[in-house]
From Swiss-Prot:
Name of the protein in its database record: Repressor protein C
SUPFAM superfamilies according to UniProt: lambda repressor-like DNA-binding domains
Entries under Pfam families matching the protein: HTH_3
DNA-binding interval(s): 20-39
Keyword hit for Transcription: yes
């Protein structure tokens, strides 16, 4: 199942542990505008999405964002939260210790 553009923006932001304000500051997209994009009230134009995806933290999600495909061998991955469903905000393993 494919996520909407707004869901993908939220997944990328949360996977990078960024607040909406931090993403706005990082990309230059005004906070209110970003809020509209994330809520699905408005769709970001291509130039805005290009700007977001060219930000160093997000280039690794470009293939996934555009095609729903990944290529880990080329550094193209999906956000971690995408693997657990669009309504989840934590991994089922988030409470476990590693090592």
């Amino acid at each position: 199942m494919s996520n909407t553009i707004s869901e993908k923006i939220v997944l990328m932001r949360k996977s990078e542990y960024l607040s909406r304000q931090q993403l706005a500051d990082l990309t230059g997209v005004p906070y209110g505008t970003l809020s509209y994009y994330e809520s699905g009230r408005s769709t970001p134009p291509t130039d805005v999405m290009m700007n977001i995806l060219q930000t160093p933290q997000f280039t690794k999600y470009t293939l996934w964002f555009m095609t729903n495909q990944i290529a880990p061998e080329f550094g193209q991955i999906a956000p971690a939260l995408a693997h657990f469903g669009q309504n989840e905000t934590t991994s089922p393993h988030s409470g476990q210790k590693t090592g």
